[in-house]
């Protein structure tokens, strides 16, 4: 029996087979004619290239303007708005984000040559008409620049937030300028030092200091201004170097020889006479005094001698000397 006759008889006996066969043929035809088939994509490429000459396009970009049916087995997607109505980030209508320093400085190229290659897009001001006032910190240009005054130069130049020249001073009148990170030669962190120093402390004389016996020699006059212990004044009247009519009567009676006299004739610190007569006690206490290593103001240098003050000793050394 012929195979073709058997196939025809089977088709006539089963009624569902033709419908299934038709669905298969329809799905096959949809796949062959749909947008996901190779033949249709190959045939649509010349049309896209003809529509946009001189520009390379992709299959997705060429069909982005219209509706694309989903692939087999997937539900259709919701329609989205066209890309023509969505704002592009590169469009001229988009507002660029400007910096806080925009047009706050003059353009150096425009100031020197009178023209700038950036034109209206330049971030600097082309003339005083475009110059804007920058929002500065409340302490801008109110303190002295530490690096400029100690090293003679500053890496920030004109953009430094601290004062380099007196013309840049924006501080309120009556407020002294402050140098940050002041240096002390005594090894202790000192507080902020005002600049310039007072006129009364500009030139200390040798006779206005009294030195107590210590293992270290007295520092030179230049180091006395930078030591924090040099400004610890004892109770009493403080005399300046040059006698003035407003000073004490003993200063007016003093002669130049007595003002510039030798150091050995000066009164010694009370701590040198207030110690005990025991040599061991003197050796243990002499090195423990906090004020004996640096010069202090002494009352009664030019006036009448004052009674010795109480001994300046730490409590721990008092207990040690008593136990011995």
Swiss-Prot record:
Domain of life: Eukaryota
Bias-annotated ranges (Low complexity): 15-46, 204-214
Modified residue annotations for Phosphothreonine: 90
Region annotated Necessary for localization of ARE-containing mRNAs to processing bodies (PBs), chain positions: 1-172, 98-324
Compartments where located: Nucleus; Cytoplasm; Cytoplasmic granule; Cytoplasm, P-body
Region feature (Interaction with CNOT1): 310-324
SMART domains from the UniProt entry: ZnF_C3H1 (SM00356)
Region (Necessary for nuclear localization): 93-166
Gene induction: By stimulation with various mitogens.
Keywords on record: Cytoplasm, Developmental protein, DNA-binding, Exosome, Metal-binding, mRNA transport, Nucleus, Phosphoprotein, Repeat, Ribonucleoprotein, Transport, Ubl conjugation, Zinc, Zinc-finger
UniProt record, GO biological process: 3'-UTR-mediated mRNA destabilization; 3'-UTR-mediated mRNA stabilization; cellular response to epidermal growth factor stimulus; cellular response to fibroblast growth factor stimulus; cellular response to glucocorticoid stimulus; cellular response to granulocyte macrophage colony-stimulating factor stimulus; cellular response to lipopolysaccharide; cellular response to tumor necrosis factor
Record keyword DNA damage present: no
Region (Necessary for nuclear export): 1-15
Domain notes: The C3H1-type zinc finger domains are necessary for ARE-binding activity.
Subunit annotation: Associates with cytoplasmic CCR4-NOT and PAN2-PAN3 deadenylase complexes to trigger ARE-containing mRNA deadenylation and decay processes. Part of a mRNA decay activation complex at least composed of poly(A)-specific exoribonucleases CNOT6, EXOSC2 and XRN1 and mRNA-decapping enzymes DCP1A and DCP2. Associates with the RNA exosome complex.
Protein name: mRNA decay activator protein ZFP36
Organism from which the protein derives: Bos taurus (Bovine)
Record gene name: ZFP36
